[in-house]
């Protein structure tokens, strides 16, 4: 049975990986609370399935565009600082949702705009998170580190919405947003204790041409293009955003 156990070696060996993993887990809990809170609030405001579904649609284009550019930035900038800044931006966006939820007449348009901004920051953050791993763990621990990052996501996607549902149904949407803000504060503090992860000396400055080259390369590789299309289809057709509040 030991061979089926989770390899925790990267967490034991690398303090910086442990900080990144813990920060990501905690902030993802909060993000999943907001993932529940946003459609619930839209349902309360409109009572419409379509209005709830639109909150998911507005995330697709920013996620794709900024996900591509996030890869360029992750190659050219300090990855720790990039992750830290995107966490801070996510905190600010959640604060906007919190303030909006406490208004007498919350703005539906503002919720849609912030949902798109969340997707953009997520697109910027994920490539930096992935690119940071080889600089934080030994080569022989890369597989275990990738598995732990996947485990972090699985825990968050299961536990986070459950916590969000309890908080929102017991208290309010505002409490859910406040809980998310608290998780981002913790995450930002943990990331601040990580070492810097500067780009290599050969890294080029981020540019539109680098982004275009990356897109051309992705389209030239059928294996990569297939994984992108599968991920996009799963996000577009399998995420139950419109069903959560009903």
Segments from the language model and where they lie:
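Alpha-helical transmembrane-bundle signature of multi-pass membrane transport and export proteins
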Residues: 1-246
């Amino acid at each position: 049975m030991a061979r089926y156990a989770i390899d925790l070696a990267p967490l034991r060996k690398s303090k910086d990986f442990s900080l990144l993993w813990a920060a990501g887990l905690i902030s993802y809990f909060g993000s999943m609370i907001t993932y529940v809170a946003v459609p619930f609030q839209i349902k309360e405001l409109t009572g419409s399935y379509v209005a709830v579904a639109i909150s998911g649609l507005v995330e697709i284009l920013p996620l794709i565009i900024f996900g591509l550019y996030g890869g360029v930035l992750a190659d050219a900038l300090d990855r720790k600082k990039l992750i830290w800044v995107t966490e801070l931006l996510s905190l600010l966006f959640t604060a906007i949702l919190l303030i909006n939820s406490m208004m007498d007449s919350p703005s539906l348009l503002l919720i849609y705009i912030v949902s798109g901004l969340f997707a953009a920051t997520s697109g910027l953050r994920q490539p930096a998170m992935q690119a940071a791993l080889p600089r934080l763990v030994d080569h022989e621990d890369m597989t275990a580190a990738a598995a732990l990052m996947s485990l972090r996501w699985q825990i968050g996607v299961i536990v986070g919405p459950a916590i969000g549902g309890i908080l929102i149904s017991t208290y309010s949407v505002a409490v859910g947003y406040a809980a998310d803000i608290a998780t981002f504060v913790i995450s930002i503090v943990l990331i601040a204790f990580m070492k810097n992860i500067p780009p290599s000396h050969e890294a080029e400055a981020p540019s539109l041409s680098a982004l275009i080259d990356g897109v051309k390369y992705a389209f030239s590789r059928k294996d990569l293009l297939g994984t992108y299309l599968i991920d996009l289809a799963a996000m577009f057709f399998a995420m139950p955003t419109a069903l959560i509040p009903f």
